[in-house]
Structures are given as structure tokens and as C-alpha cells.
């Protein structure tokens, strides 16, 4: 592009915010013009995040001072409840918005209000938002003014299911179980006793068994692709003693005669960020660390009619900031891979 895309980031002091800054610094078509934080206004980005010394000369500003309306696109890397109040004004001024919070993901307003415990401030805008699972909604994302970036668990679980659901390969009335593990960074950067090293290190636990906010988001995607499946969906998240990474083990029943690996390979043939591994493989979280990748394998359980899907992502990249940049690329007609060609870190 001859003219660079002017980008603003609201709430840039969290883990998804710094991940956006890291990825966008390597993007050839982007100028990060504004970064906001009410609590750190006036602090240089490079002082707050030493990893970005020599990369950014910007300082954090309050949203009112940052001139966000002069940006081409604004990312909201904010807690739930912020974007729904501030995004409408920017959209009215012609600014495109990608919201990394959950404010616009769930289309049914009462369902959203039940799970997030607040009244939605912009219910009329929810129907205009495009759900930004890039590999599912490319065409709609390209035309969107507002993209609801998916959650990390929904991304990790939905990507292996989408091709099978689109071809109605799952058996209705049978259980569909997602057993998921996340690194501690998924809890965010705020103070939380459960995220302390002495609590999360050398420990492994399930949480949200009675209900997790990502459950209705995943069910919404499933229900939109194949009838009779979402009702049997069970989702149990776990906290693993690692910083970043996400692993989903999904147990499902397929219709007779299905060749799921071929279905997955055909669907993702032109998707640079989804890697279908050979039968018998077991993807590892370290194989996607720092990269905008989802690696998937599928095989039938021994002496059983149950199929086992394994899916891994970096929760901060493909599960958040990387997918947001991928959506931005689609919105501006760029190659999806621009700024996202980082090789995973190993070890």
C-alpha cells in the first residue's frame, strides 16, 4: 500500500494490547498512531514495556486526547463493557473497529447480559457486528465496519469443527465434548490471586464447570452451521501451569462414511494459518508459541466410534491479537499474512 493504515489501540497496557503492539511493529502497511490508557497516560510505551524499547516513540494518552477519530481503524483491547460505550462514536465518524473484548460477539442480547452481568449499552450495533473467526467469515469481515474478535477458547474449539459442521458430518443428539487447557495469560494482566506464580505454578485445575462465558459463544457458532448439535455441547476449561498456549481435546461422533481429515484439509487448503497434521499426530502448544497458527489433528479413538480432535493455538496470538491483525488485513484488502509471518518460538 502507498498510504499506511493509521491504527489506534484502546487499552494497550494488557497482554493483548502489548501483543498488538508487537505484531503491528512488524507490519509493513501500518502506522500505530495512538495508544491509550487512562491509568498510564503520559508514560512512554517503551518505558512501560521494555521489550518495545527502540521500537515505539509513543506515549500512552487518555482516549479523549488520543485523536482516535483520525485513525483508519481502532482496536479495543479493553475489559468487557468499554467498547460498547466508546465504539459507536468512532464508527459514526467512519473509523473501523475491531473489538477484542466480548461486547459484540453474542447476537442474543439477553444471553449476553446474563453471562456478562451488565446491560448492553449498544444493542442496536450488535446485529451489525461481524464475528471475526477469519476462516469462517472472510467475505463478511472484508465489508465490516465492526468486527467482534472471537475469544481464545472459541477459536481453538471452533476451527476444527467448522468444516465438519458445514458439511453436517456430526451426529445429532450425541454429546460433543470440548476439554480445554489454557495458559495463565488468558486470565489477563490484572491482579488475581489465582494467577500468582505460587498459585498457578506446579498446579493444574478445572474452572467454570457450572458455566463459562465462552460457552454461549461456541454454541452460537455450532448452531449457525448444523442443527441438533449445540444442545449436546459440553465445555470444560482448565488452567495449565504455562504462560501462553491453549489446547483443546474435542470428542465427537461423526456420521457413517465420513473422512474427517480430508474434509479439514479441503476446507483449509487456502488458509495460511491453519495446519492440518497427519493422522496420528498430536499438536503441541509450543509448536505455535508466538505465532498466528492453529494446528489440528483428528483420529478415531481405539475400539470406539468416538473421534478425537486435537487443536492448539497461542491464546494471545491466534486467540486474540494475531487474529485481530488478520481481520484487519482482510478488511483493508491486504494479504492475510502481512505482519503475521513470525515463526513459533522454540524452546
UniProtKB/Swiss-Prot annotation:
GO terms for cellular component: cytoplasm. Keywords: Amino-acid biosynthesis, Arginine biosynthesis, Cytoplasm, NADP, Oxidoreductase. SMART domains: Semialdhyde_dh (SM00859). GO terms for molecular function: N-acetyl-gamma-glutamyl-phosphate reductase activity; NAD binding; NADP+ binding. Its EC number is 1.2.1.38. GO terms for biological process: L-arginine biosynthetic process. The active site is at 152. The keyword Transcription does not apply. Its main location: cytoplasm. It catalyses: N-acetyl-L-glutamate 5-semialdehyde + phosphate + NADP(+) = N-acetyl-L-glutamyl 5-phosphate + NADPH + H(+). Pathway: Amino-acid biosynthesis; L-arginine biosynthesis; N(2)-acetyl-L-ornithine from L-glutamate: step 3/4. InterPro entries: AGPR_AS, AGPR_type-1, NAD(P)-bd_dom_sf, NAGSA_dehydrogenase, Semialdehyde_DH_NAD-bd. It is found in: Cytoplasm. Catalyzes the NADPH-dependent reduction of N-acetyl-5-glutamyl phosphate to yield N-acetyl-L-glutamate 5-semialdehyde. NCBIfam families: argC. HAMAP family: ArgC_type1. Belongs to the NAGSA dehydrogenase family. Type 1 subfamily. This is N-acetyl-gamma-glutamyl-phosphate reductase. The gene is argC.
Amino acid at each position: 500500500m502507498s498510504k499506511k493504515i493509521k491504527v489506534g489501540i484502546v487499552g494497550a497496557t494488557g497482554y493483548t494490547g502489548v501483543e498488538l503492539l508487537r505484531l503491528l511493529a512488524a507490519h509493513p502497511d501500518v502506522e500505530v498512531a495512538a495508544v491509550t490508557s487512562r491509568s498510564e497516560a503520559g508514560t512512554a510505551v517503551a518505558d512501560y514495556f521494555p521489550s518495545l524499547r527502540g521500537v515505539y516513540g509513543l506515549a500512552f494518552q487518555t482516549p479523549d486526547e488520543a485523536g482516535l477519530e483520525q485513525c483508519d481503524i481502532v482496536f479495543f483491547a479493553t475489559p468487557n463493557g468499554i467498547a460498547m460505550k466508546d465504539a459507536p462514536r468512532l464508527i459514526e465518524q467512519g473509523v473501523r473497529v475491531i473489538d477484542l473484548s466480548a461486547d459484540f460477539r453474542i447476537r442474543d442480547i439477553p444471553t449476553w447480559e446474563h453471562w456478562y452481568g451488565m446491560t448492553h449499552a449498544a444493542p442496536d450495533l450488535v446485529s451489525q457486528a461481524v464475528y471475526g473467526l477469519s476462516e469462517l467469515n472472510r467475505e463478511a469481515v472484508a465489508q465490516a465496519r465492526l468486527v467482534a474478535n472471537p475469544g481464545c477458547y472459541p477459536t481453538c474449539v471452533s476451527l476444527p469443527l467448522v468444516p465438519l459442521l458445514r458439511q453436517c458430518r456430526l451426529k445429532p443428539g450425541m454429546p460433543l465434548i470440548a476439554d480445554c487447557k489454557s495458559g495463565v495469560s488468558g486470565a489477563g494482566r490484572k491482579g488475581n490471586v489465582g494467577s500468582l506464580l505460587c498459585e498457578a505454578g506446579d498446579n493444574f485445575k478445572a474452572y467454570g464447570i457450572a458455566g463459562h462465558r465462552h460457552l454461549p459463544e461456541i454454541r452460537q457458532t455450532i448452531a449457525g452451521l448444523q442443527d441438533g448439535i449445540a444442545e449436546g455441547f459440553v465445555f470444560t476449561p482448565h488452567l495449565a501451569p504455562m504462560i501462553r498456549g491453549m489446547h483443546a481435546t474435542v470428542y465427537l461422533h461423526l456420521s457413517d462414511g465420513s473422512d474427517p481429515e480430508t474434509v479439514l484439509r479441503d476446507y483449509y487448503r487456502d488458509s495460511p494459518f491453519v495446519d492440518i497434521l497427519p493422522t496420528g499426530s498430536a499438536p503441541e502448544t509450543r509448536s505455535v508459541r508466538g505465532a498466528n497458527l492453529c494446528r489440528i489433528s483428528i483420529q478415531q479413538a481405539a475400539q470406539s466410534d468416538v473421534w478425537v480432535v486435537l487443536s492448539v493455538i497461542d491464546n494471545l496470538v491466534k486467540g486474540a491479537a494475531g487474529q485481530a491483525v488478520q481481520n484487519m488485513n482482510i478488511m483493508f484488502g491486504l494479504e492475510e499474512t502481512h505482519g503475521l509471518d513470525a515463526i513459533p518460538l522454540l524452546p
